[in-house]
């Protein structure tokens, strides 16, 4: 499993980037968006631990390093950024095989741990990608985390007691 995760998450991206880079540089306005997972931050902890193995987590952490390195290599003709996904439709969220294997309590634990109290939608991902492509011409080497606040956890900020500054 470890080798499969490294091959599909890191090696495949590198091969595509190396082949595409000359063409992207020639265009003068190339954009690369690396898709990654919050597994690179949370690993096997909390409610997400039932989805992510160590190889997947390590590979996704590595994507962030590739994003920063490739941003340096591509600049100024090519912008390279990363969209780090949490639990979204078609990727660990509702409607996926993994989601279907969870008990109701496990699903609720994931939702409760997410500040936005839901999984993401494909429309959420599309909006983020369009922003990165069209509306962020000065952004490169950046990780945009689209996780509904999962990494922050479900803890809310308590009100301060009266008289405390």
Q: Which residue stretches match the model-derived regions?
A:
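C-terminal substrate-recognition "lid" of short-chain dehydrogenase/reductases
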Residues: 118-146, 151
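Conserved Rossmann-fold SDR core element
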Residues: 64-67, 73-90, 95, 139-146
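Substrate-binding pocket helix/loop in short-chain dehydrogenase/reductase
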Residues: 1-6, 32, 110
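A short, exposed helix-loop element centered on a Lys and neighboring polar residues
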Residues: 17-18, 68
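Catalytic loop of short-chain dehydrogenase/reductase
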Residues: 25, 31-62, 67-75, 87-88
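Generic structural signal for alpha-helix termini and adjacent loop/cap motifs
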Residues: 19, 27, 117, 134-136, ...
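A glycine/serine/threonine-rich, flexible loop-to-helix segment
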Residues: 47-49, 87-113, 153-165
């Amino acid at each position: 499993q470890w080798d499969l995760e490294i091959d599909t998450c890191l090696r495949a991206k590198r091969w595509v980037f190396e082949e595409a880079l000359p063409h992207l540089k020639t265009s003068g306005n190339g954009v690369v968006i690396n898709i990654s997972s919050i597994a690179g931050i949370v690993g096997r902890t909390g409610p997400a631990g039932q989805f992510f193995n160590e190889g997947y987590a390590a590979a996704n952490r590595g994507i962030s390093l590739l994003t920063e390195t490739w941003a340096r290599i591509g600049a100024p003709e090519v912008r390279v950024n990363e969209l780090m996904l949490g639990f979204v439709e078609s990727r660990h969220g509702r409607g996926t095989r993994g989601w279907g294997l969870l008990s109701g309590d496990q699903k609720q634990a994931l939702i409760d741990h997410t500040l936005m109290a839901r999984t993401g939608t494909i429309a959420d991902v599309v909006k983020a990608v369009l922003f990165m492509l069209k509306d962020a011409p000065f952004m490169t080497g950046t990780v945009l985390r689209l996780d509904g606040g999962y990494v922050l956890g479900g803890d809310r900020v308590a009100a301060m007691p009266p008289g405390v500054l």
